[in-house]
């Protein structure tokens, strides 16, 4: 018996009911492994808004926000009335600073930079004008004056600043000090990074600590009446450089007619090099030889006979 397609009844069909041949099942092909995506670098912190508030005749308060953080620290920059750039370093957990020692009725423009992992980001800018001078403020000729700014007790990391002022003339003193730009040849020299120290009006000296050795500092002292600047005086001072200690236990060995070996113990502090100088005991032209700082001995040759040599 045949079905309507002509195939014997019961015979298996080679075609599907839809007219397609049955294909052998395909083996599953594993999906290609995708390389893990590189993590996106973290976004840099961003500054928000800088505003000027609490304006007085000689000060302004700057406040700022951080849109995305944190920052390691901040730098506030502005120019004084002499056109000199000034800068103040602020800790990263702070969001405001009082800028004092300004001139009355004077416009100022401030720039705020954020420092993050050695990079300077920004700036934000804001402008403000100091208030009018207080009524009855003394004239330039009659106002009390600071004088005799001097430096004593200088060490590698500190110095004492002294000054003279009329008794009772100032309520307090504001001392600003910082390191000038290392190069005046830069097209845009970096301004002073300053620190501040408040001193009671009854004291006429202050010790500056935690300074860099062998470094020149710019100093500005303000005399304040209340919050207002009455006078200022400027100067500079340099801390001492580290003193290199001398080698010790100098000895001679292997002494010959025209040569000798000199030995020494190095100082506790690191030395880049040593200079061995010698000459005839009864005078004559001094000789010297430069020795690497890691050396502990040096042979002196071509010495004159029969004289001895001294160090």
UniProtKB/Swiss-Prot annotation:
Domain of life: Eukaryota
Assigned keywords, A-Z: Repeat
Keyword Heme attached: no
Gene3D superfamilies named in the record: Immunoglobulins
The Fibronectin type-III domain, residue ranges: 41-135, 145-249, 250-311
Region (Disordered) location: 1-47, 124-150
GO cellular component, one term: extracellular exosome
Listed Pfam families: fn3 (PF00041)
UniProt note on tissues of expression: Expressed in the adrenal gland.
Additional free-text comment from the UniProt record: TNX genes are located in the class III HLA region within a complex locus, named RCCX module, containing genes for WHR1/STK19, C4B, CYP21B/CYP21A2 and TNXB. Most chromosomes bear 2 modules, but monomodular and trimodular haplotypes are common in most populations. The bimodular haplotype results from the duplication of the RCCX module, leading to a duplicate containing RP2/RP1 pseudogene, C4A, CYP21A/CYP21A1P and TNXA.
Protein known as: Putative tenascin-XA
UniProt organism field: Homo sapiens
Protein encoded by which gene: TNXA
